Amino acid sequence: MVKIRLSRFGSTHNPHYRIVVTDSRRPRDGGYIENLGHYDPRKTTENYLKINAERAAYWLSVGAQPTQTARRLLKAQGVKVA
């Protein structure tokens, strides 16, 4: 199953996340199909959340399932999530 989920990067005590499309059987930080954007939970910059809404809508239309956190972030960016 194809999922839209967060993949962690950054350093110790300074997490950043990529919002990626990946196969659900892959490891959290393993390879992914497409990178949709990024999220900084510490909100250290003005653009702490950036998502390519057009590509996210495409992946949702072909059946990708977002995780609960990814769904919340997609909604925050105005992407229609069923």
UniProtKB/Swiss-Prot annotation:
One of its GO terms (molecular function) is structural constituent of ribosome. GO terms for cellular component: cytoplasm; small ribosomal subunit. Gene3D superfamilies: 3.30.1320.10. SUPFAM superfamilies: Ribosomal protein S16. GO terms for biological process: translation. It holds the Pfam family Ribosomal_S16. Keywords: Ribonucleoprotein, Ribosomal protein. InterPro entries: Ribosomal_bS16, Ribosomal_bS16_dom_sf. Belongs to the bacterial ribosomal protein bS16 family. This is Small ribosomal subunit protein bS16. It comes from Deinococcus geothermalis (strain DSM 11300 / CIP 105573 / AG-3a). The lineage of its organism: Bacteria, Thermotogati, Deinococcota, Deinococci, Deinococcales. The gene is rpsP.
